[in-house]
Swiss-Prot record:
Its EC number is 7.1.1.-. It comes from Pseudomonas aeruginosa (strain ATCC 15692 / DSM 22644 / CIP 104116 / JCM 14847 / LMG 12228 / 1C / PRS 101 / PAO1). The keyword Lipid biosynthesis does not apply. Gene3D superfamilies: NADH-ubiquinone/plastoquinone oxidoreductase chain 6, subunit NuoJ (1.20.120.1200). The keyword Endoplasmic reticulum does not apply. The chain crosses the membrane at residues 1-21, 28-48, 54-74, 92-112, 134-154. This is NADH-quinone oxidoreductase subunit J. It is found in: Cell inner membrane. It is a multi-pass membrane protein. Its main location: membrane. It catalyses: a quinone + NADH + 5 H(+)(in) = a quinol + NAD(+) + 4 H(+)(out). NDH-1 shuttles electrons from NADH, via FMN and iron-sulfur (Fe-S) centers, to quinones in the respiratory chain. The immediate electron acceptor for the enzyme in this species is believed to be ubiquinone. Couples the redox reaction to proton translocation (for every two electrons transferred, four hydrogen ions are translocated across the cytoplasmic membrane), and thus conserves the redox energy in a proton gradient. Belongs to the complex I subunit 6 family. The gene is nuoJ. Composed of 13 different subunits. Subunits NuoA, H, J, K, L, M, N constitute the membrane sector of the complex.
Length: 166
């Protein structure tokens, strides 16, 4: 089980480095999705299936769709759109697809080896404990994170509009 944790953490670090070093926002989004899925796998291997499922649903699902809309709102122009069409060849999908396939195999191995769902810590964190923590001592942190995401969305929209005016 420790191998699954370290392997998922390594994939998360590798994918996050590709997000940071990639100059194309669409390609960076692909690697960000893989990074979020790898972080979800670390939660699963630590025995927190609820946190892993939330990571997939909330971050890899909803927030990534929001990021795609923000990239689309930036309206990069016809030259960039044509360049995007050239970049979106099947070869671009090899890296994220390989990392996603490795994570899928790891998920199947983790689920097959632990029938109880307990991981490295040998305890399972259920939804009730997460809810009590989120709406208890960590309520301010959750609200600050939501405000930070909203500010990032407004800033991206504003920066996109400033470029369009010039």
């Amino acid at each position: 089980m420790e191998f699954a944790f370290y392997f998922a953490a390594g994939v998360a670090v590798l994918a996050t480095l590709r997000v940071i070093t990639n100059s194309n926002p669409v390609h960076a989004l692909l690697y960000l999705i893989i990074s979020l899925l790898a972080i979800s796998m670390t939660f699963f291997s630590l025995g927190a299936p609820f946190a892993g499922a939330l990571e997939i649903i909330v971050y890899a699902g909803a927030i990534m769709v929001l990021f795609v809309f923000v990239v689309m709102m930036l309206n990069l122009g016809p030259a960039v759109v044509e360049q995007e069409r050239k970049w979106l060849t099947p070869g671009i999908w090899v890296g994220p697809s390989a990392l996603a396939l490795v994570l899928l195999v790891e998920l199947l191995v983790v689920l097959a080896r632990t029938p109880s769902g307990a991981g490295i810590g040998h305890t399972t964190v259920d939804a009730k404990a997460v809810g009590i923590s989120l709406y208890g001592p960590y309520l301010l942190v959750v609200e600050l994170a939501s405000m930070l995401l909203l500010a990032a969305l407004v800033a991206a929209y504003h920066l996109g509009r400033q470029d369009a005016k010039q």
